[in-house]
From Swiss-Prot:
The gene is rplV. This is Large ribosomal subunit protein uL22. One of its GO terms (biological process) is translation. Keywords: Ribonucleoprotein, Ribosomal protein, RNA-binding, rRNA-binding. It comes from Streptococcus pyogenes serotype M6 (strain ATCC BAA-946 / MGAS10394). Transmembrane segments: none annotated. This protein binds specifically to 23S rRNA; its binding is stimulated by other ribosomal proteins, e.g. L4, L17, and L20. It is important during the early stages of 50S assembly. It makes multiple contacts with different domains of the 23S rRNA in the assembled 50S subunit and ribosome. The globular domain of the protein is located near the polypeptide exit tunnel on the outside of the subunit, while an extended beta-hairpin is found that lines the wall of the exit tunnel in the center of the 70S ribosome. The keyword Transferase does not apply. InterPro entries: Ribosomal_uL22, Ribosomal_uL22_bac/chlpt-type, Ribosomal_uL22_bac/org-type, Ribosomal_uL22_CS, Ribosomal_uL22_sf. Belongs to the universal ribosomal protein uL22 family. It comes from the Bacteria. Part of the 50S ribosomal subunit. GO terms for cellular component: cytosolic large ribosomal subunit. One of its GO terms (molecular function) is structural constituent of ribosome.
Length: 114
């Protein structure tokens, strides 16, 4: 049987737009786990907090479920898919209204041994 060398964590329906989340994910893709956590700590962005939590969850999954060592882990895959959009309306002049889309994101982080 093949040795499992990667672990995954997901955060679903996060109230940050996918476009803004992808900007932060691009910073950590391919980095060592310790470096990625340091980058996220100093990124002043709402998405960075969510991604940091998801990354820590993926690390915990790797250590507890698959017995991998944190020192050997690398962020191998990260992606942000679009979640359900909350549609709202903003009242405007003369009784009209403008649509507002409050976008959500499904964040996925995969860590693997290098």
């Amino acid at each position: 049987m093949a040795e499992i060398s990667s672990a995954k964590a997901m955060a679903r329906t996060v109230r940050v737009s996918p476009r803004k989340t992808r900007l932060v994910l691009d910073l950590i893709r391919g980095k060592k786990v310790a470096d990625a956590i340091a980058i996220l700590k100093f990124t002043p962005n709402k998405a960075a907090r969510v991604i940091e939590k998801t990354l820590n969850s993926a690390i915990a999954n790797a250590e507890n479920n698959f017995g991998l060592e944190k020192a050997n882990l690398v962020v191998s895959e990260t992606f942000a898919n679009e979640g359900p959009t909350m549609k709202r309306f903003r009242p405007r002049a003369k009784g009209s209204a403008s649509p507002i889309n409050k976008r959500t994101t499904h964040v996925t982080v995969v860590v693997s041994e290098k």
